[in-house]
């Protein structure tokens, strides 16, 4: 898809592009923000038991755990 420089377009072309965009947007299904927030909250709460950021990572499976001991170079 080619890039369009808006400054190079006539006023008529700009308005036509705006109308085309609005035609696309009018067909989108919209939901109330309060309903979306409820669904997102419920989704997060349902999966919080599996979330390693909430639950934590078991020490034996933590790939970032500092290794004990060291390396001796001789």
From Swiss-Prot:
<dbReference type="GO" id="GO:0042462">
    <property type="term" value="P:eye photoreceptor cell development"/>
</dbReference>
<keyword id="KW-0449">Lipoprotein</keyword>
<dbReference type="GO" id="GO:0001917">
    <property type="term" value="C:photoreceptor inner segment"/>
</dbReference>
<dbReference type="InterPro" id="IPR015898">
    <property type="entry name" value="G-protein_gamma-like_dom"/>
</dbReference>
<dbReference type="InterPro" id="IPR001770">
    <property type="entry name" value="Gprotein-gamma"/>
</dbReference>
<comment type="similarity">
    <text>Belongs to the G protein gamma family.</text>
</comment>
<keyword id="KW-0807">Transducer</keyword>
<feature type="modified residue" description="Cysteine methyl ester">
    <location>
        <position position="71"/>
    </location>
</feature>
<dbReference type="GO" id="GO:0005834">
    <property type="term" value="C:heterotrimeric G-protein complex"/>
</dbReference>
<dbReference type="Pfam" id="PF00631">
    <property type="entry name" value="G-gamma"/>
</dbReference>
<keyword id="KW-0472">Membrane</keyword>
<dbReference type="GO" id="GO:0008104">
    <property type="term" value="P:protein localization"/>
</dbReference>
<keyword id="KW-0488">Methylation</keyword>
<comment type="function">
    <text>Guanine nucleotide-binding proteins (G proteins) are involved as a modulator or transducer in various transmembrane signaling systems. The beta and gamma chains are required for the GTPase activity, for replacement of GDP by GTP, and for G protein-effector interaction.</text>
</comment>
<dbReference type="GO" id="GO:0007186">
    <property type="term" value="P:G protein-coupled receptor signaling pathway"/>
</dbReference>
<keyword id="KW-0636">Prenylation</keyword>
<dbReference type="GO" id="GO:0010659">
    <property type="term" value="P:cardiac muscle cell apoptotic process"/>
</dbReference>
<comment type="subunit">
    <text>G proteins are composed of 3 units, alpha, beta and gamma.</text>
</comment>
<dbReference type="GO" id="GO:0007602">
    <property type="term" value="P:phototransduction"/>
</dbReference>
<dbReference type="GO" id="GO:0031681">
    <property type="term" value="F:G-protein beta-subunit binding"/>
</dbReference>
<dbReference type="InterPro" id="IPR036284">
    <property type="entry name" value="GGL_sf"/>
</dbReference>
<dbReference type="GO" id="GO:0071456">
    <property type="term" value="P:cellular response to hypoxia"/>
</dbReference>
<feature type="propeptide" description="Removed in mature form">
    <location>
        <begin position="72"/>
        <end position="74"/>
    </location>
</feature>
<dbReference type="GO" id="GO:0001750">
    <property type="term" value="C:photoreceptor outer segment"/>
</dbReference>
<dbReference type="GO" id="GO:0003924">
    <property type="term" value="F:GTPase activity"/>
</dbReference>
<feature type="lipid moiety-binding region" description="S-farnesyl cysteine">
    <location>
        <position position="71"/>
    </location>
</feature>
<protein>
    <recommendedName>
        <fullName>Guanine nucleotide-binding protein G(T) subunit gamma-T1</fullName>
    </recommendedName>
</protein>
<keyword id="KW-1003">Cell membrane</keyword>
């Amino acid at each position: 898809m080619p890039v369009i420089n808006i400054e190079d377009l006539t006023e008529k072309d700009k308005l036509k592009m705006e109308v085309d965009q609005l035609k696309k947007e009018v067909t989108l299904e919209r939901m109330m923000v309060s309903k979306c927030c409820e669904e997102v909250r419920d989704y997060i709460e349902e999966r919080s038991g599996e979330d390693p950021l909430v639950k934590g990572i078991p020490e034996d499976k933590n790939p970032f755990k500092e290794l004990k001991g060291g390396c001796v170079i001789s």
